[in-house]
From Swiss-Prot:
Cofactors demanded by this protein: [4Fe-4S] cluster
Protein name listed in UniProt: Ribosomal protein uS12 methylthiotransferase RimO
Catalysed reaction equations from the record: L-aspartate(89)-[ribosomal protein uS12]-hydrogen + (sulfur carrier)-SH + AH2 + 2 S-adenosyl-L-methionine = 3-methylsulfanyl-L-aspartate(89)-[ribosomal protein uS12]-hydrogen + (sulfur carrier)-H + 5'-deoxyadenosine + L-methionine + A + S-adenosyl-L-homocysteine + 2 H(+)
UniProt lineage: Bacteria, Pseudomonadati, Chlamydiota, Chlamydiia, Chlamydiales
Domain Radical SAM core: 150-382
Gene3D superfamilies, per database record: Methylthiotransferase, N-terminal domain, Nucleic acid-binding proteins, tm_1862 like domain
A GO molecular-function descriptor: protein methylthiotransferase activity
Subcellular location: Cytoplasm
Top enzyme class: transferase
Free-text cofactor note: Binds 2 [4Fe-4S] clusters. One cluster is coordinated with 3 cysteines and an exchangeable S-adenosyl-L-methionine.
Pfam families: Radical_SAM, TRAM_2, UPF0004
GO cellular component, one term: cytosol
Paired cysteines (S-S): none
Binding residue positions for [4Fe-4S] cluster 1: C25, C61, C93
Length: 460
């Protein structure tokens, strides 16, 4: 997983200046937004400048070794750049699972908070003594918690559960985040309504596995995700709901029916498949087979022909043979997946797979990663070529990172941060970010589309 820094700031004038750096996934970002909200409500002010901050909060990621290395790099940079009197608060997944790797820098840390203890950020900052709090309790179980959005004002993430009940062989998330803990339906709907009231137009539902939502709350251990979606869709308005992280065995007919019947529940799903070969899937301790995966994808494409499917695959899992890898290449080449994340297997201490025999060399993993990436790129180029000349409804996210002469936009098949975008090079009609426009696709550059604005969507 690639990590992305998120920096939170506003103009700060007091002596209680805080500077946040959040690494890792969108779930981590929500935790950072909650901590920021708590501190702003308590009277602290956020600053963009690390060097002028009185308190520096680093929310770490530990999903893969590369993420842990990045967390350590940021910590060293903070220690070196901060003013002498500033205090560092360290939180997040790395603290919860890999604290021993942080040992050389712990003398510089004022307070350590586990990933389930974000609601204690205020007491950590105000503590006169250095300390730590590492528990498995989640703020999801608490009452109302303030939150300060760091995303553009038109979209936001809504975390409906924490932890994971799956036990995939390659993953250490359950040991970091603990077991499944679902928010109550009432709390979710309350947050959903608040986001709509704030003007958010795209709400992205996240959890370790959305489909597991409510299995810890219901007597029959069945998913209650459909209840969440039905309650949300009762709210009036022209908003988008996007689902991320929905395991293949949790996509049932009820979810498909809702996507088919209400366009506000976007025809977009992120289904982490990880592999397609049955022996590898079994070794990964996955609960679906190749046949079940193909049945699901066929059903989705048949019921909702315009659906966009995102997924992720791991290459170089222990014992993966050339033939088994070729099965994956053949599957990807068939074009089932629109947006794809590809990762080399990472031998994570504490995972079942870490102790498996037949670990694959890094050179082989890198070669397989390149082959699969090239295979998917051919699919994307073919698909993008078919989109040229079509008109799509898309939201303007903001300026392109390379030039303020360009804008970026997304249609329903593109999630923020993780998917390609539309590069808008003709935008004279755009009057504001976060608004939806009809955009003609005129070309593509790599994975990204290129387009021009035709007109604003009526009602925007």
């Amino acid at each position: 997983m690639s990590t992305k820094e998120q920096v939170f700031f506003k103009q700060a004038t007091s002596k209680n200046k805080i500077h946040f750096i959040s690494l890792g996934c969108s779930r981590n970002l929500v935790d950072s937004e909650v901590m920021l909200g708590i501190l702003l409500k308590a009277g602290y002010e956020a600053t963009e400048t690390l060097e002028e901050a009185d308190y520096l909060i680093l929310n770490t990621c530990a999903f893969l070794k590369a993420a842990r290395d990045e967390s350590k790099d940021y910590l060293q940079r903070i220690i070196k750049a901060k003013k002498e009197s500033a205090k560092i608060i360290l939180t997040g997944c790395m603290v919860s699972k890999h604290k021993e790797e942080l040992k050389p820098w712990l003398p510089y840390i004022h307070y350590v908070l586990g990933s389930g203890d974000v609601e204690h950020i205020l007491s950590a900052i105000e503590s006169k003594e250095a300390g730590e709090k590492l528990t498995s309790k989640s703020y999801l179980e608490m009452g109302e918690i303030p939150r300060k959005l760091s995303t553009p004002k038109h979209y936001a993430y809504l975390k409906i559960a924490e932890g994971c009940r799956k036990r995939c062989a390659f993953c250490i998330i359950p040991t970091i985040k603990g077991g499944l803990r679902s928010k109550s339906l009432d709390q979710i709907i309350k947050e959903f309504r608040l986001l709509l009231k704030m003007g958010v137009k795209e709400i992205i539902l996240i959890a370790q596995d959305l489909g597991d939502y409510g299995k810890d709350l219901s007597a029959d251990r069945k998913s209650c995700l459909d209840s969440v979606l039905k309650e949300m869709l009762k709210e009036p308005g022209d908003y988008w709901i996007r689902m991320l992280y929905l395991y293949p065995d949790e996509v049932d007919d009820t979810i498909i029916d809702l996507m088919e019947s209400d366009p506000r529940l976007l025809p977009y799903v992120d289904i982490p498949l990880q592999h397609i070969n049955n022996r590898v899937l079994k070794s990964m301790l996955r609960t679906t087979s190749k046949e079940q995966i193909l049945d699901l994808l066929t059903k989705l494409r048949t019921r909702i022909p315009h659906i966009y499917i995102r997924s992720s695959f791991i290459v170089g899992f222990p014992g993966e043979t050339d033939e088994e890898f070729q099965d994956l290449v053949d599957f990807v080449s068939e074009g089932w997946i629109d947006n794809l994340g590809i990762f080399s297997y990472s031998q994570e201490e504490g995972s079942v797979a870490a102790n498996m025999a037949d670990q694959i060399s890094q050179s082989v993993k890198s070669k397989r990663l390149k082959i699969l990436s090239q295979t998917q790129k051919k699919n994307v180029e073919k698909h993008n070529k078919q989109l040229v000349g079509q008109i799509v409804e898309a939201v303007i996210d903001g300026y392109h990172p390379d030039s303020e002469l360009l804008l970026t936009a997304r249609f329903y098949g593109q999630a923020p941060e993780v998917d390609p975008c539309i590069i808008v090079n003709e935008a004279r009609l755009v009057s504001g970010f976060g608004e939806r426009y009809l955009i003609e696709i005129t070309g593509y550059v790599g994975y990204d589309l290129v387009g021009r604005v035709i007109k604003k969507v009526p009602g925007e």
